[in-house]
């Protein structure tokens, strides 16, 4: 593979339907510290094919799912905590942190598009796998949040992922006792990085 020091370009594939907000901070840091090296993003939305690579034309990939690609390393990159999304008129707003037992009294809306994301498994562990009984599945996260805003139920997801829906009739509270979760993974080749690539990876790890 040609060194990105020669091409002065970092190519990153962004996998899945959601882009972590930290990516904007990473790109801004890259521009400020190394403006001569351009970061080129390529979106790729197909969460159902977690074991496959979209193509071979990139240096890094950013994913909400831990992926196993031959010849690549997948490392946890950015972390978050679980939160509860609810309608702005919900009685759950009385809680500073929503207790798990209150969640189990509600209809919980989840999206099929996030099924393979690691935080979904964490949610089930927190509730000892009994949450399935209360879940209503819809196709996408956007549809799930639309129903939440309309008062049809609540949703559980990383706090940063819910933040962008606050202007759509949705309120957010932390989930009481929730563990820290991995929100995004960085994938890179299992080989020596060029100096340019190594600096980009270091900046990615510095962003929180």
Give the label of every model feature segment.
Residues 1-13, 32, 70-73, 94, ...:
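Short helix-loop hinge/linker segments at domain boundaries
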Residues 23, 106-130, 193-197, 201:
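Secondary-structure junction motif
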Residues 45-50, 54-57, 64, 114-171:
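Hydrophobic hinge/microswitch elements
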Residues 10, 22-25, 171-208:
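A late-sequence structural motif
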Residues 72-82, 86-108, 198:
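Flexible hinge/capping segments at coil-to-helix
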Residues 70-76, 80, 142-192:
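Beta-alpha-beta core module
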Residues 9-15, 61, 85, 109, ...:
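Short, well-ordered beta-strand segments
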Residues 7-68:
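Central regulatory/effector-binding core of bacterial HTH transcription factors
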